[in-house]
């Protein structure tokens, strides 16, 4: 049996299902490219039949990614498989992942079929998917609660039909390690053709067992783990990619397996996913939390000064986190910024040095010292602003009356090349700024969540504002970054305005396309 564990990332499929607002195609592509740098073997990037947007994002990623295998999900239905195959056809190499429920409660209550009918559907789906690719994965949904006799029959039949990867999901996070390991061991003992496929696991974290169950499965012969960055996913989330990667690396002598993950990309990829998905990382999160390498106990600090491995089983450098947060000032030249970005793992293709340096100088003038985490935040915002925007905030002036609690905001905005200046009052400076922006853009949206977080340390830290807004019954996520909270809030709103503007253009395009089809058919 191979000692190589395949890392199957499903951040852009299962992970995205947990988000309040869908990611744009550009944002999904950013994450996909980061996952490729991270070294994931397979990335599941969407469910093409579910929506035109998902189809487009899968196709865009499939066309771009070269070093990881791109995968799309489909139910055990021919129309789903057709959509997946069509979206993936532009890829150099791809996988179709088809699934059906196998537990008694799912078969009877959800599918309302007999197990024999479900078995027949599974076999038919695998055979149909094999028409498009040799790389077909089949999942037994809710395998953790499936009677073991039925599970063995399903796995044997799917392999015989042509599946080269068999996925055993603990869909509702119900099992414990000894139980889940026993399921994997039983499959190896009882399925006669199991050597013709790779056994995969996909564990959810409802009882906090996803990582432990996945590691136990590897000890019993599984050689693919399905996971997400930061463990994001439905309900309590999925198995965390960064935890799996570092467990297998740190305990290699015990577990005897390895992955192809470039661990030095973990920190950067984790931050990108957190920012784009608007899902902050808890400070005590294993591997990537802010406190993961922090030692506050005096005894621990003394030990660390004498020998780092007294209290560190891995180093921050091993995940790409540099201990030396070198401070930079407005006197630092472009070469310093370029060097620091290279030290953090960013190539010049990942950012615009001139634009980043201009933003750096602006920030350095405001706060004096600029640190690595500031640069990363600026690079992230510079990448977000790289698209052509219909609305561009040029100036924001706010005045507050502390006695009456009323604020006045004046904004100057470039609206499609026309400069508009508007003023408005509100219940506080942020409300006033939002009202002024709404006037200038003549675009009304409903904000359903507002979140403020600090990016950096001290009183001059950058403030990041994340908002979720509803426009035409669709959720949009905007982000703004500035040393001033009101400015960050305004930038987040303008970001959302631009997203809704693009959504309108897409809707108009689709409407015209349908009209042209109707005219052509007359």
UniProtKB/Swiss-Prot annotation:
Its main location: cytoplasm. It holds the Pfam family HMGL-like. Residues 392-522 are annotated as: Regulatory domain. It is found in: Cytoplasm. It is an enzyme of class 2 (transferase). The keyword Transferase applies. Pathway: Amino-acid biosynthesis; L-leucine biosynthesis; L-leucine from 3-methyl-2-oxobutanoate: step 1/4. InterPro entries: 2-IPM_HCS-like (IPR050073), 2-isopropylmalate_synth_dimer (IPR013709), AIPM/Hcit_synth_CS (IPR002034), Aldolase_TIM (IPR013785), LeuA/HCS_post-cat (IPR054691), LeuA_allosteric_dom_sf (IPR036230), LeuA_bact_synth (IPR005671), PYR_CT (IPR000891). Keywords: Amino-acid biosynthesis, Branched-chain amino acid biosynthesis, Cytoplasm, Leucine biosynthesis, Manganese, Metal-binding, Transferase. Mn(2+) binds at residues 14, 202, 204, 238. It catalyses: 3-methyl-2-oxobutanoate + acetyl-CoA + H2O = (2S)-2-isopropylmalate + CoA + H(+). Its cofactor is Mn(2+). One of its GO terms (biological process) is L-leucine biosynthetic process. SUPFAM superfamilies: 2-isopropylmalate synthase LeuA, allosteric (dimerisation) domain, Aldolase. The keyword Manganese applies. PROSITE patterns: AIPM_HOMOCIT_SYNTH_1, AIPM_HOMOCIT_SYNTH_2, PYR_CT. GO terms for cellular component: cytosol. GO terms for molecular function: 2-isopropylmalate synthase activity; acetyl-CoA C-acetyltransferase activity; manganese ion binding. Gene3D superfamilies: 1.10.238.260, 3.30.160.270, Aldolase class I. Its EC number is 2.3.3.13. Homodimer. PANTHER family: 2-ISOPROPYLMALATE SYNTHASE 1, CHLOROPLASTIC-RELATED, HOMOCITRATE SYNTHASE-RELATED. Catalyzes the condensation of the acetyl group of acetyl-CoA with 3-methyl-2-oxobutanoate (2-ketoisovalerate) to form 3-carboxy-3-hydroxy-4-methylpentanoate (2-isopropylmalate). Belongs to the alpha-IPM synthase/homocitrate synthase family. LeuA type 1 subfamily. This is 2-isopropylmalate synthase. The gene is leuA.
């Amino acid at each position: 049996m191979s000692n190589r564990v395949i890392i199957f990332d499903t951040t852009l499929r299962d992970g995205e299902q947990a988000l309040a607002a869908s990611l744009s195609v550009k944002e999904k592509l950013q994450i996909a490219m980061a996952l490729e740098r991270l070294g994931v073997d397979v990335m599941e990037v969407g469910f093409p039949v579910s929506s035109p947007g998902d189809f487009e994002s899968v196709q865009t990623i499939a066309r771009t990614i070269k070093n990881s295998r791109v995968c799309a999900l489909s139910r055990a239905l021919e129309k789903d498989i057709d959509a997946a195959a069509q979206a993936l056809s532009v890829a150099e190499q791809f996988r179709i992942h088809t699934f059906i429920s196998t537990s008694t409660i799912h078969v009877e209550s959800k599918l309302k079929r007999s197990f024999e009918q479900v078995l027949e559907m599974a076999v038919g789906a695998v055979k149909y998917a094999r028409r498009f690719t040799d790389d077909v994965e089949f999942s037994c949904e809710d395998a953790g609660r499936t009677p073991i006799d039925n599970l063995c029959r399903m796995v044997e039949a799917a392999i015989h039909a042509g599946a080269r990867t068999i996925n055993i999901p603990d869909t509702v996070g119900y099992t414990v390690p000894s139980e889940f390991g026993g399921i994997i061991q039983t499959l190896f003992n009882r399925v006669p053709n199991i050597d013709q496929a790779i056994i995969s696991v996909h564990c959810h974290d409802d009882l906090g067992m996803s990582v432990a169950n996945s590691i136990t499965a590897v000890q019993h012969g599984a050689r693919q783990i399905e996971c997400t960055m930061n463990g994001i996913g439905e309900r309590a989330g999925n198995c965390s990619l960064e935890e799996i990667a570092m467990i297998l690396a740190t305990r290699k002598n015990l577990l005897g397996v390895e992955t192809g993950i470039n661990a030095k990309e973990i920190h950067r990829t984790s931050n990108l996913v957190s920012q784009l998905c608007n899902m902050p990382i808890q400070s005590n999160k294993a591997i990537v939390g802010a406190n993961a390498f922090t030692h506050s106990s005096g005894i621990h600090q003394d030990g660390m000064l004498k020998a780092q491995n007294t209290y560190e089983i891995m180093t921050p450098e091993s995940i790409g986190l540099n201990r030396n947060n070198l401070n930079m000032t407005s006197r630092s030249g472009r070469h310093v910024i370029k060097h620091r970005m290279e030290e953090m793992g960013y190539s010049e293709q990942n950012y615009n040095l001139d634009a980043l340096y201009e933003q750096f100088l602006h920030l350095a003038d405001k706060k004096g010292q600029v640190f690595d985490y500031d640069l990363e935040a600026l690079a992230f915002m510079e990448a977000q602003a790289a698209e052509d925007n219909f609305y561009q905030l040029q100036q924001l002036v706010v005045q507050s009356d502390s006695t009456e609690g009323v604020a006045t905001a004046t904004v100057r905005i470039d609206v499609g090349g026309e400069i508009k200046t508007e003023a408005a009052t509100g219940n506080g400076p942020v409300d006033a700024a939002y009202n002024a922006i709404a006037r200038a853009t003549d675009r009304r949206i409903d904000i359903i969540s507002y979140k403020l977080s600090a990016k950096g340390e001290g009183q001059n830290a950058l403030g990041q504002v994340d908002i979720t807004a509803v426009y035409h019954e669709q959720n949009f996520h905007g982000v703004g970054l500035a040393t001033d909270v009101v400015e960050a809030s305004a930038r987040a709103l303008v970001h959302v305005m631009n997203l809704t503007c693009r959504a309108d253009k897409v809707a108009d395009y689709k409407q015209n396309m349908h009209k042209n089809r109707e005219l052509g058919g007359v």
